[in-house]
């Protein structure tokens, strides 16, 4: 039976050889030394193929959240629902206010009313003088 031992990676931060211990399925553990010249701030791992840089003094430290992913997702959805709900509530309230203010305004009189629509349709010139006295500015009424 074969046992698998987790691979270990040992590196130094200065220039020098790095040692790798890898596990194989046939229980033969080999230790290889690879002279890999790396800078003091660069460590390349053989298994991931990525270059990892240690955090520098100027970099920000990543926050460790005390909440699980589910709780964070629920918080985000709750905030989104609150924002969308507030927008919908404001639009609903503004529509209700607009409908209320329109009902307070007097409707236009029907076209059959006795109010003349234009000066061409006026039949009695004496009525137009009385109507014009209400619509003319004060200076013009005082002169006539």
From Swiss-Prot:
Gene name, per UniProt, is GYPA
Subunit-level organization? Homodimer. Component of the ankyrin-1 complex in the erythrocyte, composed of ANK1, RHCE, RHAG, SLC4A1, EPB42, GYPA, GYPB and AQP1. Interacts with SLC4A1; a GYPA monomer is bound at each end of the SLC4A1 dimer forming a heterotetramer.
* Topology in the lipid bilayer: Single-pass type I membrane protein
Chain intervals with Polar residues compositional bias: 1-25, 33-48
Where in the cell is the protein located? Answer: Membrane
Transmembrane feature ranges? 70-92
> Matching Pfam families, A to Z?
Glycophorin_A
Q: Which residues, renumbered to this chain, carry the PTM Phosphoserine?
A: 118
Q: Which InterPro entries match?
A: Glycophorin (IPR001195), Glycophorin_CS (IPR018938), GYPA_B (IPR049535)
Similarity-based family: Belongs to the glycophorin-A family.
Q: Which parts of this chain are annotated as the region Disordered?
A: 1-55, 101-144
Q: Which residues are glycosylated?
A: 2-4, 8, 10-14, 22-23, 30, 36, 38, 44-45, 48, 51
Q: Which UniProt keywords apply?
A: Glycoprotein, Membrane, Phosphoprotein, Sialic acid, Transmembrane, Transmembrane helix
Where is the secretion signal located?
none
**Which spans does this entry mark as compositional bias, Acidic residues?**
121-130
Q: Which organism is it from?
A: Macaca fuscata fuscata
- GO CC annotation, single: plasma membrane
Name listed for the protein in its UniProt record = Glycophorin-A
Q: Which domain of life is it from?
A: Eukaryota
By its UniProt entry, which Gene3D superfamilies does this protein fall under?
Answer: 1.20.5.70
Its function? Answer: Component of the ankyrin-1 complex, a multiprotein complex involved in the stability and shape of the erythrocyte membrane. Glycophorin A is the major intrinsic membrane protein of the erythrocyte. The N-terminal glycosylated segment, which lies outside the erythrocyte membrane, has MN blood group receptors. Appears to be important for the function of SLC4A1 and is required for high activity of SLC4A1. May be involved in translocation of SLC4A1 to the plasma membrane.
> Which cystines does this chain contain?
none
